[in-house]
Amino acid sequence: SSGIGYALCEEYLKQGWNVIGLARDGTKIPNKTIDNPKFEFVKTDLSNFDSSKLIIDEVFKKNANISTFILNAGIYIPDSLNDFNFENAKATFDTNVLSIYLSIELIKKNFELNSNYTLAIMSSTAGYKGLPKSILYGPSKAALINLAEAIKSEMHDNLNVKLICPGFVETPATKVNSFKMPYLMSPKEAARIIYSKIYKKGFEI
């Protein structure tokens, strides 16, 4: 409903796609998007696995021709070694990692693995190296990098697997950072770059 996720919805709508957007809060989404006949908003908290499983399953059953899945759920809690706690760690991994596994399980259930579709997993360059205030976020994104690479190693012929690792993007998450963020870009620009590469050859964006 914000950041890169919302910007991707807007980019896909601009390119003429029908878009289904899942988020826990739709109040941030502008009316121009909500009112777009090509856009459907589905409210669900992906860290609530039981309810999300039912909701996503129903979405997939009603939309048998989905051709692109962008798994973008994520939260950023800026914790360091001195102030992190287990509750924040669990919240981070529930949303950033386990909800992605849940989504993949439901994709497998409703769509043939050899179907011609794109499966994109949103990680981050923070997954490659530890950063300040990223003792929770960084490891969760590192897990997604490994997950995408593992899926790619089992690549099915018609499955286009993409690993997306944005750098620093202007979002509520990066606003709390006090360190220098090189090559900082807008969500709109990040979405444009992602869309321009997601259907081309290559694994990582």
Residue ranges of each PLM-predicted region?
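Conserved NAD(P)H cofactor-binding loop of Rossmann-fold oxidoreductase domains
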Residues: N72-I77
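C-terminal helical subdomain
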Residues: L163-I164, F179-I205
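Residue(s) in the substrate-gating loop at a strand-loop-helix junction
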Residues: S124
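Active-site loop immediately N-terminal to the catalytic Tyr-X3-Lys motif
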Residues: N82, K129-I135
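Canonical Rossmann dinucleotide-binding motif of NAD(H)/NADP(H)-dependent dehydrogenases/reductases
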Residues: S1-N18
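Active-site helix of classical SDR
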Residues: I104, S140
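Substrate-binding pocket helix/loop in short-chain dehydrogenase/reductase
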Residues: S80-L81, N85-F93
